[in-house]
């Protein structure tokens, strides 16, 4: 059949069908960086990500520390976030990598650019150093990282949003307890393989810290692919800053008690740097472990889940007393791909308070998310999500995060949508 121009102009439905068919059949996630320089011994890449988010959320039973009820929320647009990253590969065989990235705009600093990661990764011996036998043997088995880098705890980083880097997250929001933390230190890791490991030592804070009594953090991970689509891992983290003052005046590890990369639900439950998220503990004497499992095979279904537990043995720091706080948390999500460009997703995540201020607790926070995404192009993703979250079971007087009274069973629910661009 041949259509002339008049036929086409009279058939907007046909045009719409053709456009949708092209989008659904061709679009899919891009895994590219822009190469901006390439020589025999140096390659430089740049990446850029930006995201705009709209929300229509409501909240109930939200009271601050003084007992005043916090007002409801209006629908609207969030601040647009942005990230800029640079990766350099040096040596004839790219033996050395240097990476740094900037938060151009973020929830913590919406109008200020500041650094996120910046590190050196050595994969082999540069040609200029010759081939020392011992070092060659070592770097044939391991890689070495040094600088400010994301502490490799758990596998959730492959399923969550990090400021404007959102396209690996099938939904809009993150997990209700969402461990993530950039710290300064060194890391030794095995070469990529079916089985692997890493160990790292950092200063246990997210910036330089030379306070007397500051501890040093250790973390480790082992992982395995028992069969090709299945990945399992176990992570461990420990640090002790309890010889420094309590609160922000002392050293603290914010793996759990802070979230610089932000949460996606603007102003809910008192707002802050991660609105809606549970930010447990003071980051003083912390021990944590997490088990992760991922299934990502040829089928249209992708599965991910984790379970973890974290405790702070002394939230007071060097003040009198040793109040303990501990939480258990878990999550599961499923993604179903209808085509390379269209998918649906659902996630359940929860946090159980085991002990608050040395008192056993039955408090629980549940978050349910479901939605989906459409790849408009290989670099643009549109997502929509419905979310509902509620606190329950906390004892009278229990407060969390920004002084929100958890015992009053605060909750929020509604719809969020975002459009992101990345290369």
Name each region found by the language model.
Residues 1-8, 31:
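Short, Lys/Arg-enriched N-terminal segments with co-localized hydrophobic residues
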Residues 7-16:
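Bacterial N-terminal signal peptides that target proteins for export
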Residues 16-25:
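Bacterial N-terminal signal peptides
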Residues 26-32:
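Sec/Tat signal peptide C-region and signal peptidase I cleavage site
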Residues 34-58, 71-207, 212-241, 330-341, ...:
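Outer membrane beta-barrel
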Residues 59, 69-71, 119-122, 232-240, ...:
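Outer-membrane beta-barrel pore domains
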Residues 62-63, 159-162, 398-399:
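Short, glycine/charged-enriched secondary-structure capping and boundary segments
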């Amino acid at each position: 059949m041949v259509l002339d121009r008049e036929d086409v102009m009279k058939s907007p439905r046909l045009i719409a069908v053709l456009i949708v068919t092209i989008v659904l059949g061709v679009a899919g996630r891009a895994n590219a960086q822009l190469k901006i320089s390439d020589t025999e011994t140096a390659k430089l890449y740049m990446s850029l990500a930006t995201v705009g988010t709209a929300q229509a959320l409501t909240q109930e039973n939200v009271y601050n520390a003084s007992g005043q009820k916090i007002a409801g929320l209006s629908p609207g647009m969030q601040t647009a976030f942005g990230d800029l990253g640079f990766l350099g590969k040096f040596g004839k065989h790219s033996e050395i990598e240097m990476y740094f990235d900037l938060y151009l705009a973020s929830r913590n600093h919406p109008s200020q650019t500041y650094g996120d990661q910046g590190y050196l990764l050595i994969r082999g011996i540069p040609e200029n150093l010759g081939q020392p036998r011992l070092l060659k043997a070592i770097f044939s088995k391991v890689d070495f990282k040094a600088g400010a880098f994301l502490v490799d705890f758990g596998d959730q980083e492959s399923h969550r949003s990090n400021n404007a880097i959102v396209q690996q997250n099938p939904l809009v929001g993150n997990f209700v307890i969402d461990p993530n933390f950039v710290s300064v230190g060194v890391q030794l890791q095995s070469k990529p393989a079916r089985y692997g490991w890493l160990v790292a030592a950092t200063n246990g804070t997210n910036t330089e810290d030379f306070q007397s009594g500051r501890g040093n953090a250790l973390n480790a991970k082992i992982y395995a692919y028992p069969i090709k689509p299945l990945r399992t891992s176990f992570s461990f983290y420990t640090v002790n800053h309890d010889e420094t003052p309590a609160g922000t005046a002392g050293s603290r590890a914010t793996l759990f008690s802070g979230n610089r990369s932000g949460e996606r639900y603007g102003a809910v439950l008192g707002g802050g740097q991660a609105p809606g998220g549970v930010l447990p503990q003071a980051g003083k004497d912390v021990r944590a472990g997490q088990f992760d499992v991922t299934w990502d095979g040829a089928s249209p279904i992708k599965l991910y889940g984790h379970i973890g537990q974290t405790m702070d043995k002394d939230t007071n720091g060097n003040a009198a007393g040793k109040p303990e706080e501990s939480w258990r948390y878990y999550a599961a999500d499923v993604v179903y791909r209808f085509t390379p460009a269209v998918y649906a997703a659902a996630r359940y995540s929860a946090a159980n308070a085991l002990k608050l201020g040395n008192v056993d607790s039955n408090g629980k926070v549940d978050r349910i998310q479901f939605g989906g995404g459409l790849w408009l192009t290989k670099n643009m993703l549109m997502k929509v999500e419905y979310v509902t979250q509620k606190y329950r079971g906390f004892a009278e007087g229990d407060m969390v995060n920004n002084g929100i009274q958890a015992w009053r069973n605060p909750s929020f629910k509604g719809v969020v949508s975002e459009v992101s661009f990345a290369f």
